Amino acid sequence: MLLHIPGLFDADELARIREALEQADWADGKVTAGYQSAKAKHNLQLPEGHALAKEIGSALIDRLWKTPRFMSAALPHKVFPPLINCYREGGNFGFHIDNALRQPKGSPERVRTDLSSTLFLSDPDSYDGGELVIQDTYGVQQVKLAAGDLVLYPGTSLHKVNPVTRGQRYAAFFWAQSLVREDSQRALLFEMDNAIQQLTADVPDHPSLLQLTGTYHNLLRRWAEV
């Protein structure tokens, strides 16, 4: 399941973020890649724990936690703190699958990467290439969103970032461990939650709503890991 979450940051905020990123000291992106992924990774990244990455990441997570659509789809349990990357001319990341487990720097906790998220920070007309290409059950999806928009997709997906041929592509990305490990189960719960919300708006007093809501929570109780 791919999900588009629009408008998490406004134009003024994005302009300030990009100005700060232009002055930042970048590191080779290979430092956070696994052995196989490092062979395909050609980009720049703010070091883990960098003050600017922490500031952007904290604002991003705070807004997502207040976004019902994201919470319904992801059912997040734990999050690997967001990282910030930059693709300049020639920068790319070949096809790969993210490592199954991530351990934040300085933390004993590990995060299972059930879900991946990318927040686009650059206007799409400011750079050429740089599409996020995701292979899913419906084929190949190419994603290049407006600045401030986020895409959520299964961490099990084979994906890549096409070469940037002009300009710079800034983005934030992170992984989440869901309360529900299996993507198909999360998708079913998301569809059911959406239907319940729509029925609540259309026929708020319908007696079946109580039963449907109970079924949702019973399924969540069966599948959730806490």
Swiss-Prot record:
EC number(s) recorded for this UniProt protein: 1.14.11.-
Q: Which GO terms describe its molecular function?
A: 2-oxoglutarate-dependent dioxygenase activity; iron ion binding; L-ascorbic acid binding
Cofactors (names): Fe(2+); L-ascorbate
Q: Where does 2-oxoglutarate bind?
A: R169
What's noted on cofactor binding?
Binds 1 Fe(2+) ion per subunit.
EC class of the enzyme, as a word:
oxidoreductase
> Which top-rank group of organisms is this from?
Bacteria
Which SUPFAM superfamilies does the annotation name? Clavaminate synthase-like
Q: Which residues bind Fe cation?
A: H96, D98, H159
Output the PANTHER family linked to this UniProt entry. PKHD-TYPE HYDROXYLASE YBIX (PTHR41536:SF1)
Q: What is the protein name for this chain?
A: PKHD-type hydroxylase PputGB1_0905
